[in-house]
């Protein structure tokens, strides 16, 4: 049996925070605001995985009202989500992600992101696709106010 999940997330830029996307720290003058480390891509992937098994979203499992998750490493959160998915009897078919940002340029970091995500999801890098686009200076991402991301995951029963 196959299950498909979709995820979407956005985070606003702020001074004085590191920019972490896909488990990789990216040099930039601003980072993203969030209760955790605000890794917009890993949050999106977690939501897609949880959605595929009809288990809610990242906020249900790691609420921003819980101080235990303040400044949490999103890689650890995704590992916990993936462990839960595997306990339900699923493995990854493939994952396709899009980062939506005017700046910084993501291309130099995409292979590192793919590698890190493949490690977190215990799969071959060949099952992970990450791409990036801009909104041609339209909307909040185009005005460089934040970053958005989307992901689609295909899970299959073990």
Swiss-Prot record:
Q: Which InterPro entries match?
A: MECDP_synthase, MECDP_synthase_CS, MECDP_synthase_sf
GO molecular-function terms, A-Z: 2-C-methyl-D-erythritol 2,4-cyclodiphosphate synthase activity; metal ion binding
Annotated cofactor note? Binds 1 divalent metal cation per subunit.
The keyword Lyase is assigned to this record: yes
Protein's UniProt keywords contain tRNA processing: no
Q: Which residues bind a divalent metal cation?
A: 9, 11, 43
The catalysed reaction is: 4-CDP-2-C-methyl-D-erythritol 2-phosphate = 2-C-methyl-D-erythritol 2,4-cyclic diphosphate + CMP
Q: How does it assemble?
A: Homotrimer.
> Could you tell me what this protein does?
Involved in the biosynthesis of isopentenyl diphosphate (IPP) and dimethylallyl diphosphate (DMAPP), two major building blocks of isoprenoid compounds. Catalyzes the conversion of 4-diphosphocytidyl-2-C-methyl-D-erythritol 2-phosphate (CDP-ME2P) to 2-C-methyl-D-erythritol 2,4-cyclodiphosphate (ME-CPP) with a corresponding release of cytidine 5-monophosphate (CMP).
Name the UniProt record assigns to this protein: 2-C-methyl-D-erythritol 2,4-cyclodiphosphate synthase
Where does this protein come from, organism-wise?
Answer: Bacillus cereus (strain ATCC 14579 / DSM 31 / CCUG 7414 / JCM 2152 / NBRC 15305 / NCIMB 9373 / NCTC 2599 / NRRL B-3711)
Q: What is the lineage of its organism?
A: Bacteria, Bacillati, Bacillota, Bacilli, Bacillales
Q: Which gene encodes it?
A: ispF
């Amino acid at each position: 049996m196959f299950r498909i999940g979709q995820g979407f997330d956005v985070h606003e830029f702020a001074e004085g925070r590191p920019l972490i996307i896909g488990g990789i720290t990216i040099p930039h003058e601003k980072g993203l605001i969030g209760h955790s480390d605000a890794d917009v891509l890993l949050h999106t992937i977690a939501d897609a995985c949880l959605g595929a098994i009809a288990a809610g979203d990242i906020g249900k499992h790691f609420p921003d009202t819980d101080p235990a998750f303040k400044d949490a490493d999103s890689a650890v959160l995704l590992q916990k989500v993936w462990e839960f998915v595997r306990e339900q009897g699923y493995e990854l078919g493939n994952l396709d992600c899009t980062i939506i940002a005017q700046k910084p340029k993501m291309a130099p970091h995409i292979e590192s992101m793919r590698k890190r995500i493949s490690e977190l999801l215990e799969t071959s890098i060949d099952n992970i696709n990450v791409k990036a686009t801009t909104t041609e200076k339209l909307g909040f991402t185009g005005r460089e106010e934040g970053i958005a991301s989307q992901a689609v995951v295909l899970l299959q029963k073990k």
